[in-house]
């Protein structure tokens, strides 16, 4: 969970972001390099690339119309969700939005840090949730030193507060600049600090340094709540308040209210589906334009795979001829061309053991050796070693929590996250297979019923539901009610993103003529009560939770495990069906070396899968490796306690938890399993593994289980 060579696109490839016939979109996203604390960089900056994921050599490309099966099954398993993602990418402000999951997981961390800075106990009181701009002058005076009257001005960079030369202008859009007049937003105006620096004749330097530290912490934490990439822009000229922009106790109340409204501008709803793209949104209906484009893309991928295979064969012949010439010369001329072979996994494990033993000298030497042979632009092992070395270095320096907070506080474009998710769907069957099985199981359960209520824990962007809505329109249109549950977002609109997901889904339901109702819940999952869900016993009730339960804390953090609390709530809901998908991992152990080893094995499978299927130059692959999986690895390695939010367990551990909650596991429909296996073996790499164990559907890569899916019912309905 980072001097970069120039990267070139693969000529002749089509842009996968144009799969659904929508208007042209930017084909790449940029990464802003940020250097954090120890000097190494966790972010990428690359040229614009237009690439398509290269299918593996063993993939088979078969048209849907050649199979004697229900074409609707092909629709469900095809990239139906890509049309939904493409529509989201066409929304005007998607590039400016930050990732929903990123914000929700860090809100609690931000609250805790603010309370630690002022010496109060968490959890916060309601008034504490206000942004930094709403603090009163008394609280601000306790944070800002009162004797800023001396020499240099202060700049706020990634490394903390730094003295800068005079003459710069401090702008919150550019935190590393500074001026001799420092203005900080406050509830009744701007409090202004005049002078050229800090008075060295302070009577109490210790108190002064503490105030500086507190001020730095408050600025860093407050920036997380500022809209649009931490920019806080207050336009007093438009509000006719220029003359009152300084601290003034006699300013007008009207001007106060106008200034407050300008600090955090209200976000007004927009048309989720604009008129120029409504006609082009097709959810990959068999025979439709989107399916034709999908088949054309498969043809292009097939040609690319054949070309790559031929190129690899020619390269092997050249290497064989080179070895033959070397032997003919007696082997003396080939020594300089040999590359040093390094077992990066062993080095990483030995380094983790040294870090756990606090052997800094040995750990430093091993880290230096790992850095020498790892790179974010090499093969899969080198990229994996680079990510894990970042985590080890942060843990060794004792700055893991600060570095992780610094990374997650940097906004990630929601468009970039969607494009990366689009790539993951294209190259890996895990989530697509889960969507297909879940939707097919729900449809079979609903049958001819007139009403269905889906409660989705961790709905995020609602990727899986457009296909279900479309299928309901094909085989009867029951009233669909979806309750989308997400963690709250920071700011004054904690439910904004989950509400936007509902608006998109409502637009799809209207497009296909399906009666639809949506309710958004933005709360901590363990704080949700049964009354919040509006259960109607006359409806078919389905609870869905796919691959998000790992972010709930367990008994090692909280005596009353959040995981058991949520499962007990699901038992009280008494659903007709509970679909449960988990990330299968054993790296939730309290002992660091054990956790590190298991995390290394888990992420090795993912990085090897990407190395086998996706070209190294692909931008979205780099984003997945560094910004998604690399960030998760950093959290697992460098963070402890409540700050460690990546806590997956094995499917056997989750099985025990679910049974303790009064749930009974039921088998999958054999016909669904048969269709799923056929699809995976037909359209995906041969090294993807689909298996069953104790009624769990196991999905993995080269024999290692990565994800698991199961279906449960209450004891009363089993």
From Swiss-Prot:
<feature type="compositionally biased region" description="Basic residues">
    <location>
        <begin position="316"/>
        <end position="328"/>
    </location>
</feature>
<dbReference type="GO" id="GO:0005634">
    <property type="term" value="C:nucleus"/>
</dbReference>
<dbReference type="GO" id="GO:0003700">
    <property type="term" value="F:DNA-binding transcription factor activity"/>
</dbReference>
<keyword id="KW-0804">Transcription</keyword>
<dbReference type="GO" id="GO:0006355">
    <property type="term" value="P:regulation of DNA-templated transcription"/>
</dbReference>
<feature type="short sequence motif" description="VHIID">
    <location>
        <begin position="452"/>
        <end position="456"/>
    </location>
</feature>
<keyword id="KW-0539">Nucleus</keyword>
<feature type="region of interest" description="VHIID">
    <location>
        <begin position="421"/>
        <end position="484"/>
    </location>
</feature>
<feature type="region of interest" description="Disordered">
    <location>
        <begin position="305"/>
        <end position="338"/>
    </location>
</feature>
<feature type="region of interest" description="Leucine repeat I (LRI)">
    <location>
        <begin position="342"/>
        <end position="402"/>
    </location>
</feature>
<feature type="domain" description="GRAS">
    <location>
        <begin position="335"/>
        <end position="713"/>
    </location>
</feature>
<protein>
    <recommendedName>
        <fullName>Scarecrow-like protein 9</fullName>
    </recommendedName>
</protein>
<feature type="region of interest" description="Leucine repeat II (LRII)">
    <location>
        <begin position="500"/>
        <end position="532"/>
    </location>
</feature>
<feature type="region of interest" description="PFYRE">
    <location>
        <begin position="541"/>
        <end position="635"/>
    </location>
</feature>
<dbReference type="InterPro" id="IPR005202">
    <property type="entry name" value="TF_GRAS"/>
</dbReference>
<dbReference type="Pfam" id="PF03514">
    <property type="entry name" value="GRAS"/>
</dbReference>
<comment type="similarity">
    <text>Belongs to the GRAS family.</text>
</comment>
<comment type="function">
    <text>Probable transcription factor involved in plant development.</text>
</comment>
<keyword id="KW-0805">Transcription regulation</keyword>
<feature type="region of interest" description="SAW">
    <location>
        <begin position="638"/>
        <end position="713"/>
    </location>
</feature>
């Amino acid at each position: 969970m980072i001097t970069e060579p120039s990267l070139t696109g693969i000529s002749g490839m089509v842009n996968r972001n144009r799969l659904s016939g929508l208007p042209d979109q930017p084909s790449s996203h940029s990464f802003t390099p940020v250097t954090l604390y120890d000097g190494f960089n966790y972010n990428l900056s690359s040229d614009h690339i237009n690439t398509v994921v290269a299918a593996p050599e063993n993939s088979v490309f078969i048209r849907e119309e050649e199979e004697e099966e229900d074409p609707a099954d092909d629709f469900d398993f095809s990239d139906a969700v890509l049309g939904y993602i493409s529509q989201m990418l066409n929304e005007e402000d998607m590039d400016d939005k930050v990732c929903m999951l990123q914000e929700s997981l860090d809100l609690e961390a931000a609250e805790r840090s603010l309370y630690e800075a002022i010496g109060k106990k968490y959890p916060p009181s309601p008034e504490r949730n206000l942004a930094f701009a709403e603090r009163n002058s008394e609280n601000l005076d306790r944070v800002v030193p009162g004797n800023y009257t001396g020499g240099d001005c202060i700049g706020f960079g990634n490394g903390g507060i730094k003295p800068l030369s005079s003459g710069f202008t401090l702008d919150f859009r550019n935190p590393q600049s500074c001026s001799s007049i420092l203005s900080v937003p406050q509830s009744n105006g701007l409090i202004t600090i005049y002078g050229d620096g800090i008075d060295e004749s302070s009577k109490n330097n210790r108190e002064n340094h503490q105030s500086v530290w507190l001020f730095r912490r408050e600025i860093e934490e407050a920036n997380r709540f500022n809209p649009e990439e931490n920019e806080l822009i207050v336009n007093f000229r438009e509000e006719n308040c220029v003359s009152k922009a300084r601290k003034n106790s006699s300013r007008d109340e009207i001007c106060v209210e106008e200034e407050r409204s300008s600090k955090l501008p209200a976000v007004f709803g927009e048309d989720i589906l604009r008129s120029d793209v409504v006609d082009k949104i097709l959810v990959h209906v068999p025979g439709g334009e989107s399916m034709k484009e999908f088949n054309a893309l498969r043809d292009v991928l097939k040609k690319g795979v054949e070309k790559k295979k031929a190129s690899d064969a020619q390269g092997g012949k050249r290497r064989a001829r080179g070895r033959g010439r070397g032997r003919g010369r007696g082997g003396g001329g080939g020594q300089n061309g040999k590359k040093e072979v390094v077992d990066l996994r062993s080095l990483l494990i030995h380094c983790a053991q040294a870090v756990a033993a606090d052997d800094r000298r040995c750990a430093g030497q091993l880290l230096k050796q790992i850095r020498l042979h790892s790179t974010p632009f090499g093969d899969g092992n080198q990229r994996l070693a680079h990510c894990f070395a970042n985590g080890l270095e942060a843990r060794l320096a004792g700055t893991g929590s600060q570095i992780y907070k610094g990374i997650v506080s940097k906004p990630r474009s929601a468009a970039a996250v969607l494009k990366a998710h689009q790539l993951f769907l294209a190259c890996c069957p895990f989530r697509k297979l889960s969507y297909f099985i879940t939707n097919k199981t729900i449809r079979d359960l609903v049958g001819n019923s007139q009403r269905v209520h889906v409660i989705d824990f961790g709905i995020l962007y609602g990727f899986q539901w457009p296909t279900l809505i479309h299928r309901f329109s094909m085989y009867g249109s029951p009233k669909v009610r979806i309750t989308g549950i997400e963690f709250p977002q920071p700011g004054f609109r904690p439910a904004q993103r989950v509400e936007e997901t509902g608006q998109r889904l409502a637009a799809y339901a209207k497009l296909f003529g399906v009666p639809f109702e949506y309710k958004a819940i933005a709360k901590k999952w363990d704080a949700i009560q049964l009354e919040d869900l509006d259960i109607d016993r006359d409806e078919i009730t389905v609870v869905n939770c796919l691959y998000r339960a790992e972010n709930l804390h367990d008994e090692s953090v909280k005596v009353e495990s959040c995981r058991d609390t949520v499962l007990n709530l699901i038992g009280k809901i008494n659903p007709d069906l509970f679909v449960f998908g988990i990330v299968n991992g054993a790296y939730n152990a309290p002992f660091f070396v054990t956790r590190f080893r298991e995390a290394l094995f888990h992420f090795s499978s993912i990085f090897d899968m990407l190395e086998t299927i996706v070209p190294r130059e692909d931008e979205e692959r780099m984003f997945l490796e560094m910004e998604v999986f690399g960030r998760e690895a950093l959290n697992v390695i460098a963070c402890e306690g409540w700050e460690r939010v990546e806590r997956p367990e094995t499917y056997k551990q989750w099985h025990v938890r679910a049974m303790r909650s009064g749930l009974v596991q039921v088998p999958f429909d054999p016909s669904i399993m048969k269709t799923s296996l056929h699809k995976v073996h037909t359209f995906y790499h041969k090294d993807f593994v689909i298996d069953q164990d104790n009624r769990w559907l196991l999905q993995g890569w080269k024999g290692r289980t990565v994800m698991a899916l199961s279906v449960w019912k209450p004891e009363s309905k089993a």
